[in-house]
Amino acid sequence: MRINKELHIKDVFIIESKKHHDNRGWFQESYHMDNMSKHEFDLVFVQDNLVFSKKHVLRGLHFQDDNGQGKLVSCVKGSIYDVLVDLRKNSNTYREWMGIKLSEKDSKFIYIPPGFAHGYYVIEQDSLVNYKCTKHYNPNEEIGIVWNDSDIQIDWCDIDGFNSSNVIMSEKDQLNKTIKELNL
């Protein structure tokens, strides 16, 4: 397991976990508390989620108002473009975003700490995303930022096949507000 902590946004990191292949298929360790502790990450996950999505689905950008959730995100099947936005007001990268392609082929995971908005665009049909959370989901604390907020300027066009007219969103996500409207 290799952990990359040298990203431009502090406290976000990427984990690469090797897949062990044989004639039966493959095995991959998705989380190992002792290995994470060696890298000074003492994380306790309390909820594990699986999300199945069609191609062109865009989920987010979501965050929880009360200290938020840390998330360990991976794409188990298919591929996604995963995006996070730093909403920690005392951070040097406040309101900055980063994106990473996650797929079943690349064996990468991304850890997103509390204080970030998170979302993703589904690149391949029938993609399956897994994320572990450091805090239980609370619908009363959930807030959404619109995916194309002009103050954040996420470059979704960097994704193969992305076309804003093809985006599929939930009714709830269509009502997300801008960062200005939310006073963030």
Please place each PLM-identified region on the residue numbering.
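Conserved metal-binding segment of the jelly-roll/cupin
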Residues: 102-125
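Non-catalytic, conserved peripheral segments adjacent to functional cores
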Residues: 1-105, 126, 133-184
